[in-house]
C-alpha cells in the first residue's frame, strides 16, 4: 500500500508540470519528501510552523509562518496539500519577479480586499522582525517595524491614500530593489 502512495498519479504530475517550474524528477522528489514529512498528505498550520521555525533558530517564526501558510493554502481549507505546496514553492523559489511580488502582495493583504493597509503591512513587518530576531542589524530608519512600515509606505504609496494597491506595490518594488530587500527581510542580502 505504501508503495503506490509514493508515486503521483500521471494526471496530477502533468498538472503540476503545467503549473509549476519543476521537472518530472523534481516533482517526484518533492512528493517523496512531502509524504515523509506529512504521511496524511496534508500539512496543518501547526506542522507548518514547526517546519518553518527550523529555518529561523534565533527568532520566533510562528506568526510569519501563519501568514505564509495562509498564502500557500489556496483553497482556504486550513491545510496545505501537495499541489498547493508545490505551486507556492514554485512561485517563491523559481517564479519571475512579478509572480513573486503578486504572491507577496497576497500575503500582506490580510483581509483580501485588494489593498495593503498600513496596519496590514505593520503586522507582517512585525512578524518578520520577530522571526529574524537579533540576527540582523537594521539601519536607523528601519530599526523598528513602525519605522520600516513608514519607509515602505513613503516609497510605495504614490497617491498617498494610506493603502497600497497591487500596481503601487509592484511598481514600487520594481523601481527600487531596496524595497524588495525590505519586503523579503533576507539576511543574505545585508
UniProtKB/Swiss-Prot annotation:
**Which Pfam families has this protein been placed in?**
EF-hand_1 (PF00036), EF-hand_7 (PF13499)
In terms of InterPro entries, this protein maps to: EF-hand-dom_pair, EF_Hand_1_Ca_BS, EF_hand_dom, Recoverin
Q: Name one GO biological process term.
A: regulation of signal transduction
**Residues annotated for Ca(2+) 2 binding in this entry:** 109, 111, 113, 115, 120
Q: Which UniProt keywords apply?
A: Calcium, Lipoprotein, Metal-binding, Myristate, Repeat
Lipid-bearing positions (N-myristoyl glycine): 2
Which superkingdom?
Eukaryota
Residue positions binding Ca(2+) 3:
157, 159, 161, 163, 168
Q: Which gene encodes it?
A: Nca
Q: Please tell me in which tissues this protein is expressed.
A: Expressed in neuronal tissues. High level expression seen in the cortical regions of the central brain and lower levels in the lamina, the first optic lobe of the brain. It is also found in the thoracic ganglia.
Query: When the coding gene is removed by deletion, what phenotypic consequences does the entry describe?
Result: Viable. Adults exhibit reduced night-time sleep but daytime sleep appears normal. RNAi-mediated knockdown in the whole organism or simultaneously knockdown in the C01 and A05 neurons, results in a similar phenotype to the genetic knockout.
Chain residues that bind Ca(2+) 1: 73, 75, 77, 79, 84
Give the organism the record lists: Drosophila melanogaster
**Coiled-coil region list:** none
Q: Which family does it belong to?
A: Belongs to the recoverin family.
Keyword Metal-binding: yes or no? yes
Entry protein name: Neurocalcin homolog
Q: Name one GO molecular function term.
A: calcium ion binding
Biological role: Calcium-binding protein that is essential for promoting night-time sleep and inhibiting nocturnal hyperactivity. During the night-time it promotes sleep by limiting synaptic output from arousal- and wake-promoting neurons within the C01- and A05- domains that include the mushroom body, and the antennal mechanosensory and motor center. Regulated by the circadian clock network and light-sensing circuits that include the CRY photoreceptor; it is likely that both of these internal and external cues are required to define the temporal window (the night-time) during which this protein functions.
Domain spans labelled EF-hand: 40-58, 60-95, 96-131, 144-179
